[in-house]
């Protein structure tokens, strides 16, 4: 039996304009459409495939999704549940606002401690809003578990997990004894689309809501005021312009060179 927890995150849609708030320079999540991060969809899909493969062999496992976020993050939870996850845990506390990756990793590690029987934690390699790529490793360190990161394949058998990590130097095969924490990249799979039946079933699935107090995290351990890293100054990116039009009357090449020099490109 493999009980899997998948870390998911609601992020601003990459097709929307993303910006920081004027006050504390944190990501303005209300200014853009919010979606379940695509890499998390792949993480959920991988967990479901492991569960389904084991079910063929008569092994019963479960898939739980875990997220930290505001009330709006429920939308991402329901998406994962509609794909086929069994239940969810939602760490919802205003004290988490502005937390850096270390604080987020600590809170999620504590939340994982409330989920009994966890044998495998699957996460995406990095979120599209922060692009830090370190939270899975931080969680593994806090929990004292082996970490296999940036995997393109996963295989679970005999109480062990094996996966391939592709780098510029080559492809490496990694192995660890469960329980373990892994992160996957975009090559791991193609996530399924939720069926109508799955969407309807998701509305009835269990979602446990936790606060910081319930996972044993003090308010002075997380949040923007206690973060080890924060944004101090933000400058909006310049508006797009139409550019400069060059009419070639025999000296087009010279005009292009002059333009590039003026822009300090060459």
UniProtKB/Swiss-Prot annotation:
Transmembrane segments: none annotated. Heterodimer of an alpha and a beta subunit. CDD domains: ETF_beta. GO terms for molecular function: electron transfer activity. The electron transfer flavoprotein serves as a specific electron acceptor for other dehydrogenases. It transfers the electrons to the main respiratory chain via ETF-ubiquinone oxidoreductase (ETF dehydrogenase). It holds the Pfam family ETF. The keyword Metal-binding does not apply. It comes from Mycobacterium leprae (strain TN). Its cofactor is FAD; AMP. Keywords: Electron transport, FAD, Flavoprotein, Transport. Binds 1 FAD per dimer. Binds 1 AMP per subunit. GO terms for cellular component: cytosol. This is Electron transfer flavoprotein subunit beta. InterPro entries: ET-Flavoprotein_bsu_CS, ETF_a/b_N, ETF_b, ETF_beta_N, Rossmann-like_a/b/a_fold. Belongs to the ETF beta-subunit/FixA family.
């Amino acid at each position: 039996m493999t009980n899997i927890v998948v870390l998911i995150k609601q992020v601003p849609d990459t097709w929307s304009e993303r910006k920081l708030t004027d006050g504390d320079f944190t990501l303005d999540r209300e200014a853009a459409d919010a979606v379940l991060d695509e890499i998390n969809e792949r993480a959920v899909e991988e967990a479901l495939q492991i569960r389904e493969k084991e079910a063929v062999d008569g092994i019963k496992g479960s898939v739980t999704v875990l997220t930290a976020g505001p009330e709006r993050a429920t939308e991402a939870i329901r998406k994962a549940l509609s794909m086929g996850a069994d239940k969810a845990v939602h760490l919802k506390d205003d004290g988490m606002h502005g937390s850096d990756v270390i604080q987020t990793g600590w809170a999620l590690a504590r939340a994982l401690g409330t989920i009994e029987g966890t044998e495998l934690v699957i996460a995406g390699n990095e979120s599209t809003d922060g692009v830090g790529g370190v939270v899975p490793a931080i969680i593994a360190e806090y929990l004292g578990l082996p970490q296999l990161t940036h995997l393109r394949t996963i295989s679970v058998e005999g109480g062990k997990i094996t996966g391939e990590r592709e780098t510029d130097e080559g492809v490496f095969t990694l192995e660890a004894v469960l329980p373990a924490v892994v992160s996957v990249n975009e090559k791991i799979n193609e996530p399924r689309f939720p069926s109508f039946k799955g969407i309807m079933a998701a509305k009835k699935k269990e979602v446990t809501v936790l606060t910081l107090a319930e996972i044993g995290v003090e308010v002075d351990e997380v949040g923007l005021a206690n973060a080890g890293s924060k944004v101090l100054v933000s400058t909006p990116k310049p508006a797009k312009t139409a550019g400069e039009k060059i009419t070639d009357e025999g000296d087009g090449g010279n005009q292009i060179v002059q333009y590039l020099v003026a822009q300090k490109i060459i």
